[in-house]
Structures are given as C-alpha cells and as structure tokens.
C-alpha cells in the first residue's frame, strides 16, 4: 500500500485491499505521482537506499543542464543515455512511482542510474564546453576550484538564482547569496 510505503517504508504484503483498490494500485503502479519530499521528507532518513537514490536523482537533475546543451555529449552518447530514462527521473528528483519505490527498495533502480550518472559526470568534467560552465564560488573567489552543482557533497545551490557555492563557504559565511544581493541592489 502506498501509504505504508510513504509513511513507514513498509513493503510487507500483510495488508489486504478490496478488488477495486487492487485494480487501482495496478493501474497507477508505473505512474510517477508521489512527491516524497512533499508527502514525507523524513522518509529519506529512514531508508539509506532511498537517500542514495535521491542523491543520484538530484545529481542527474543538475547534470542534465550540461548534457542536454552540449554538442559533444550528443556525439559520445551521453544525451542518449540520459534519454533512456523517463524524463521525470532527471527533471523532478522527488517524484516517484510505486514501481520506482519498489525498485529502490530492491536496489534495481540504483543499478540502472549509477552507471549513467558516472558516465555523465565524467563527460562534464572532461569536456571543455561543459567544464567552462562550472562555477567559481563567489564567497571565497578561489579560481582554482571550479565547482558544479551536481557535486552535492561539496556544493550548495542558491534556491533563488541557482548560483553554486562551496557548502562550507555558504554555511560558514552565513551570508545571503552575493548574486541575489547584487540583483536586489540593482532593483532599488
């Protein structure tokens, strides 16, 4: 039952449902309609597999911006790799179908996504066009450390303007985003 999965990460078959509910669940099994972050954000803390899946999908979300705009990514098959996935996987990282949740629990979805993420990340870091789209942290201004929003362990992204910063700089400085500050100043 979706409610047990989303609230408790419980996939047991001990819950009985009516024939109507059974048919309905079968019909929606592959439909991506569950926003886990909106329904139960604490679920990511309950399941390491779901947490890892969310990290992979967030990484794909940021990688797609580079891959879909790079002509070299088309030539070396990276765009095709991305497009083998349903678009919601990389466009909406918190949206899941029941099938996705089951495959996450079984580790099957991770086996599909991880090689794709590795291939795309490798392309971005080696491609001159993609690498040129990297960020310099505006807080520390370290030009030798090019950062990318898909490096979730070391970067933070401003929710307002999507600028990218070292997480340590962003959190330690307790500053508002410099780009948002400039934009706000210009409007006055």
Please give the residue ranges for each predicted region.
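Cys/His-rich zinc-coordinating modules
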Residues: 3-159, 168-174, 178-188
């Amino acid at each position: 039952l979706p409610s047990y999965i989303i609230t408790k990460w419980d996939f047991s078959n001990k819950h009985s449902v009516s024939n109507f509910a059974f048919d309905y669940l079968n019909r929606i099994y592959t439909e991506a309609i569950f926003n886990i972050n909106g329904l139960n954000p604490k679920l990511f803390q309950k399941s390491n597999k779901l947490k890892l899946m969310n990290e992979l999908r967030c990484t794909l979300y940021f990688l797609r911006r580079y891959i879909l705009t790079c002509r070299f990514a088309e030539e070396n098959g990276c765009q095709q790799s991305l497009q083998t996935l349903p678009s919601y996987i990389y466009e909406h990282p918190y949206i899941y179908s029941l099938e996705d949740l089951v495959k996450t629990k079984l580790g099957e979805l991770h086996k599909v996504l991880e090689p794709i993420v590795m291939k795309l990340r490798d392309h971005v870091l080696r491609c001159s066009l993609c690498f040129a789209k990297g960020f310099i942290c505006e807080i520390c201004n370290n030009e030798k450390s090019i950062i990318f929003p898909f490096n979730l362990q070391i970067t933070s992204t401003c929710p307002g303007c999507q600028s990218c910063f070292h997480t340590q700089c962003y959190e330690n400085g307790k500053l508002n985003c410099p780009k948002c500050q400039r934009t706000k100043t210009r409007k006055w």
